[in-house]
Structure formats: structure tokens, C-alpha cells
């Protein structure tokens, strides 16, 4: 199976998000890469489901709370930008202050 670099990146994000999801379910607080991966994967999946950019920008702020992440992580993440594939093409989704 041949994958493009973009497809490999998507799989890497998905794998990291899956790990983050499992750790969150166990009650573990997420670190920086896990938090970014979980938010990014949720945005990409939402785009695949047909949500709009505006909906995903709002949705991105509901995925994690300060209680879900290690101390200081919320302050480190000011924006998350994800190139997501929508039915009408690829668009950049920016989620400002995603962890509230």
C-alpha cells in the first residue's frame, strides 16, 4: 500500500489521538502532543462528516477542558490549525483557545 506524505500525517494524528482518547478514558491528564492530536483528529473527522468550518471552530473548543490536560498545557495551546478535507475541498480550520 502506497501512502502520500499527507495520508501518513493523517494516520499519525489518528494514532496519537486514539492513544490520547484511551489515556483520557483512564483518567490520565493529557500532555501537549496528545491534546493537539485529539483536537486535530476530531476536527478532521467532523469535516469528513460534513460539518462547516464555522461549526468545527466552535466544536474544537468543546473537546477538552482544563481538567483533561496537565498543568500549564491549556496556556501553551493558543491555536490549533488543521487542514481538513471537506466535501468541497481542503480547508484550513483554526480553533482559537481550544482548551477552556
From Swiss-Prot:
Q: What species was this sequence derived from?
A: Teredinibacter turnerae (strain ATCC 39867 / T7901)
Family matches, as InterPro entries: Urease_gamma, Urease_gamma/gamma-beta_su, Urease_gamma_sf, Urease_subunit
Q: Name one GO molecular function term.
A: urease activity
Any one GO CC term of this protein is:
cytoplasm
PANTHER family, sorted: UREASE
**Which pathway is it part of?**
Nitrogen metabolism; urea degradation; CO(2) and NH(3) from urea (urease route): step 1/1
Q: Please identify the protein, giving its name as recorded.
A: Urease subunit gamma
State the similarity comment: Belongs to the urease gamma subunit family.
Q: What is its main location?
A: cytoplasm
Report the catalytic activity.
urea + 2 H2O + H(+) = hydrogencarbonate + 2 NH4(+)
Q: State which Enzyme Commission number(s) the record gives.
A: 3.5.1.5
Q: Where in the cell is it found?
A: Cytoplasm
Q: Which gene encodes it?
A: ureA
Which keywords does this chain's UniProt record carry?
Cytoplasm, Hydrolase
| GO biological process, alphabetically ordered | urea catabolic process
Summary of subunit composition and partner proteins: Heterotrimer of UreA (gamma), UreB (beta) and UreC (alpha) subunits. Three heterotrimers associate to form the active enzyme.
User: Do you know which CDD domains this protein is assigned to?
Assistant: Urease_gamma
Q: Specify the enzyme's EC class, one word.
A: hydrolase
Give one Pfam hit by family name. Urease_gamma
